[in-house]
């Protein structure tokens, strides 16, 4: 049954009446015929989960786009629903690079999504750069002093302390 399309960070998945649906339906039927009833499952994820799945994957160096985030969000949801064993291996199909949809990441960091997306950023996913030294501080400090001051500020930002040996 065709569905109404709404704004989505996973635009490629938001197709109201995909031409490939009859083929997918046939493949699912064949999969269940071979594996038995209930071996094929579908989970639904929300926009918030999709964008945060992408950010989580990217934070760990996987360079995923929003569709990759959707895959990861679906995996998390499937595990929560008990559709997978805790240690079961999963392979995710993340087909595009994060740069393709970098605007969605920027909207998340800036909290500028239009209301239709129903996405509210969470602080723990906002990985925005922070200045260590202002431009004025940088130009007023000569080489070695700049390096020492930048190092000191980074230590403070990270909450590090001197370790006694």
Predicted regions and their residues:
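Claisen-condensing/thiolase-fold acyl-transfer catalytic domains that form or cleave C-C bonds
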Residues: 47-104
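Active-site/ligand-binding loops adjacent to catalytic centers
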Residues: 1-63, 108-165
């Amino acid at each position: 049954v065709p569905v109404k399309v709404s704004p989505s960070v996973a635009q490629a998945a938001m197709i109201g009446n995909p031409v490939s649906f009859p083929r997918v339906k046939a493949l699912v039927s064949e999969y269940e015929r071979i594996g038995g009833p209930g071996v094929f499952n579908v989970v639904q994820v929300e926009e918030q989960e999709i964008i945060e799945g992408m950010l989580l994957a990217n934070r760990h160096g996987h360079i995923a786009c929003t569709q990759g985030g959707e895959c990861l969000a679906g995996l998390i949801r499937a595990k929560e629903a008990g559709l997978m064993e805790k240690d079961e291996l999963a392979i995710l199909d993340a087909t595009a690079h994060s740069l393709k949809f970098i605007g969605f990441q920027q909207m998340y960091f800036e909290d500028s999504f239009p209301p239709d997306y129903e996405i509210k950023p969470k602080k723990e996913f906002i990985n925005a750069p922070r200045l260590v030294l202002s431009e004025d501080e940088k130009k007023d400090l000569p080489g070695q002093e700049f390096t020492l001051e930048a190092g000191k500020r980074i230590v403070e930002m990270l909450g590090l302390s001197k370790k006694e040996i």
